[in-house]
């Protein structure tokens, strides 16, 4: 499992390559990603966050072992080699337990790390930046680093115990905004300063030394920083290389380290490529992929309304809206404004809070109904042109089958293609 270390080595040697991390648990997104990586013969990095997947099940209901089983089963069904699959754990630390005293939260974090490592996750993001119930706000670099070193020790011991060798690759640090897109409307974003990045690295190096973990420093492959990219509900802050140039140059002094950029969703292809060139060589993407899934489903629902009598339609859009109104916990604190503004946000926001609702049984039934309705007879080409114009071109050229499932998968892959191109290197 040396794909990441090798990628970093090549990048540091001047190749300007990178890797993207697919941060989603949706089966169609994962199928799209696995098929795309297979077609391009590249390794695939899939990550779960501490919110999605933990030892108690997370919001997906999956433990790390469950998630690995789910992904590996999907990979096997698509003939994707498991040795080309890299699993990562994102924001692993006390994130889920900030309402508990630090001692209790960190005990849970120890178990979280054990469960991820024992399940075979090899890329481990240690993030102890969040304050717990009895902590000062914000935490000092030293406290954050001490807690990360504690978790690294647990990770190393667990890896040796289960696999007989310590081959984990680590990411440290955190971006300033909360994971998964900003809550509030954005106008400008502070880029991590070189001094702050150096302070984080030195605090971690010192804390790792105190834990007797000097030997693993070359396996700390990336530092999470804020290069000045983010999105909120309707806006994207685009990467501005000039603002990040000092930060970009700073990492050139570390021979085994690159940067990891979170919230790169919705950046232009040019910005994604420039991020990789500027050493932000691990690009995280999640909401943009489920946003593309949602776009394709809304387009297919519009096609269905043109072709199928109203009483036989799936009503996917309305079912989705009804379930989100009935169970508002995943969007209520994120979407603001009057009723119409919130309605638009539920359907179309870049932050894509709708992604939390796809596993709901009513919505899943409506999705299956939609696919059945459109699979019965060929979708007329003019309707594909109207509602899925990018896919229409590929259908007409004969490279894409115009079935509902293939249209959805291909629309998601259009986003993956931007990341692949950005990461390919020279």
Curated annotation (Swiss-Prot):
Protein name stated in the entry: D-tagatose-1,6-bisphosphate aldolase subunit KbaZ
Subunit structure, as described in the record: Forms a complex with KbaY.
A Pfam family annotated for this UniProt entry: GatZ_KbaZ-like
Family annotation (InterPro entries): Aldolase_TIM, GatZ/KbaZ-like, GatZ_KbaZ_carbometab, TagBP_ald_KbaZ
Pathway: Carbohydrate metabolism; D-tagatose 6-phosphate degradation; D-glyceraldehyde 3-phosphate and glycerone phosphate from D-tagatose 6-phosphate: step 2/2
GO-annotated cellular components: plasma membrane
GO biological process: carbohydrate metabolic process; D-tagatose 6-phosphate catabolic process; phosphoenolpyruvate-dependent sugar phosphotransferase system
SUPFAM superfamilies: Aldolase
């Amino acid at each position: 499992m040396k794909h990441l270390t090798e990628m970093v080595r090549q990048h540091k040697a001047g190749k300007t390559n990178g890797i993207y991390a697919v941060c989603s648990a949706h089966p169609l997104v994962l199928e799209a990603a696995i098929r795309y990586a297979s077609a391009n013969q590249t390794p695939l990095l899939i990550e779960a966050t501490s919110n999605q997947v933990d030892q108690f099940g997370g919001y997906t209901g999956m433990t790390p072992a469950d998630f690995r089983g789910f992904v590996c089963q999907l990979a096997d069904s698509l003939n994707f080699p498991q040795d080309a699959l890299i699993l990562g754990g994102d924001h692993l630390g006390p994130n889920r337990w900030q309402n508990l005293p630090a001692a209790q939260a960190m005990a849970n974090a120890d178990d979280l790390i054990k469960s991820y490592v024992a399940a075979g996750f090899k890329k481990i993001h240690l993030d102890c930046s969040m304050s717990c119930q009895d902590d000062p706000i914000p935490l000092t670099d030293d406290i954050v680093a001490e807690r990360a070193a504690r978790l690294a020790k647990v990770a190393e011991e667990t890896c040796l115990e289960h696999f007989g060798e310590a081959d984990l690759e680590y990411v440290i640090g955190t971006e300033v905004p909360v994971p998964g897109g900003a809550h509030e409307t954005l106008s400008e974003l502070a880029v991590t300063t070189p001094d702050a990045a150096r302070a984080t690295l030195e605090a971690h190096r010192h804390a790792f030394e105190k834990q007797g973990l000097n030997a693993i420093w070359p396996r700390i492959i990336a530092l999470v920083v804020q290069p000045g990219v983010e999105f909120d509900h309707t806006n994207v802050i685009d990467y501005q290389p000039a603002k990040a140039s000092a930060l970009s140059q700073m990492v050139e002094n570390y021979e085994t380290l690159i940067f990891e950029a979170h919230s790169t969703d919705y950046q232009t292809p040019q910005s994604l490529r420039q991020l990789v060139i500027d050493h932000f060589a691990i690009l995280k993407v999640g909401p943009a992929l489920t946003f593309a899934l949602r776009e394709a489903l809304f387009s297919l629902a519009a096609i269905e309304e043109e072709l199928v009598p109203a009483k036989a339609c799936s009503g996917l859009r309305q079912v989705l809206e009804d379930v989100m109104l009935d169970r508002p916990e995943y969007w209520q604190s994120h979407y603001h404004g009057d009723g119409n503004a919130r309605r638009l946000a539920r359907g179309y926001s870049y932050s894509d809070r709708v992604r939390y609702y796809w596993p709901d049984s009513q919505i899943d039934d409506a999705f299956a109904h939609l696919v059945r309705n459109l699979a019965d007879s060929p979708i007329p080409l003019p309707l594909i042109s109207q509602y899925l114009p990018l896919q229409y071109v590929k259908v007409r050229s004969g490279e894409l089958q115009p079935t509902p499932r293939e249209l959805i998968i291909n629309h998601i892959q259009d986003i993956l293609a931007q990341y692949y191109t950005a990461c390919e290197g020279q």
